[in-house]
Amino acid sequence: FDTKSSTYTYIISSGNGREALIIDPVLENVNEYINILKKLDLQLVKVIDTHIHADHITGASKLKDITKCSTIMGDHTPADAVEIKVKDDEYIKLENLKIKAMYTPGHTSDSYSFLMDNYLFSGDTLLINGTGRTDFQNGDSKDAYNSIFNKLLKLPDETFLYPAHDYKGEKVSTIGKEKKQNPRLQVGSV
């Protein structure tokens, strides 16, 4: 967790081998990630960014320089330095794990969420008791509504939600809990 930007970064490993990937790495914390990987005897092979935004100063390029990992984003990203651009419903593999890319625009036009089994890494699209802002940097409230209500909230209620930000110290929720308690989801339409 980066206290300056309130950004959560996730390190994922299959548990069956040494490969790891990182979702939404923060540039200022790259050395911390490298130390964690070394301590756990993991090799970073992939880095995924959910989107580009002012509060997402990515450490992907620096991690690539250090570890030779692949950098991944959704195919709507304007970023030139990304090696692999995944499409909606495409899978990213990490040893025996499969992570589904889900195009979820709204917060930004390049926002993606990533689903691994029943774990959703939602970037800034769906937050705990909130949603990502749509009022600047290529945001669109209708796209956000469609991404959240017609895609993410269609996932099973027991799906765990891991957002890229939280400003109140919450770390995890579920789709079911968000449907019931998230004040921004208590709307009929846009």
Language-model segments: residues:
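Short secondary-structure boundary/capping segments
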Residues: 1-2, 13-14, 61-62, 83-84, ...
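Conserved beta-strand hairpin/beta-sheet module of binuclear metal-dependent hydrolase folds
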Residues: 1-42, 113-123, 129
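Active-site HxH/HxHxD metal-binding segment of metal-dependent hydrolases
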Residues: 5-6, 17-18, 27-103, 180, ...
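Generic anion/oxyanion-binding catalytic loop in active/binding sites
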Residues: 22, 52, 133
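Hydrophobic residues in well-ordered beta-strands that form the structural core
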Residues: 23, 71-73, 122, 163
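Short, conserved glycine- and acidic-residue-centered signature motifs
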Residues: 26, 56, 137-141
